[in-house]
Amino acid sequence: MTSRWAISVDESLNCIFVKWGRNPSLEDTRQYFETLVGLPAFRAGAHMFNDLRALAPDLPASFFRQAARFGPTTPAAGQKLALLVSSEVAFGLMRIFATFRQRPGLEVDVFDDLEQARKWLGLPADIGDPFEDMADDNPVSDSNRTEAR
C-alpha cells in the first residue's frame, strides 16, 4: 500500500512540516500519526504545519471525524497545529477535523493563507513556502518520507 504524506522536521524552527497528497486513506492517516508520535521533535512540543492544499474536496465529512481519532491524546502543552487548505470546501472539512482534534494543550486552526498560518505559528517571514522543496504529489503518494532539515 502506498501512503500519501511526507514529513520534514526543522528543529531550529521548532516545527514539523507535513505535506499531504490528494487522496489519503484512513490507514495513511493512522500511519502518519504513528510516525508523528515517534518523532523526538513532536515529543519535545514542536508545532505542526500541515499542507493540505492538494487534498481532494470530495472526501466525506465522516473521514475527518474518524481520522481525528487516530491522533495522539496527550500533546505537549502549548503545541499548535496549523492546517493549510486551498478551497472553501476543504476549509469546512478541516474545521470538522479541527473540532475533533482539539485537546488540552493543543491549539488547532485552519488557514487558507500561507502567511497567516506562518505568523500564527510564529515562523519567520523569510522561510517562504516551507513545503516548496518537499515532494510533489506523485512522490508523496508513492511513499512516506520523514527527513530532518
Please state what every model-predicted region is.
Residues M1-R149:
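Amphipathic, Lys/Arg-enriched alpha-helical "gate/interface" segment within cytosolic domains
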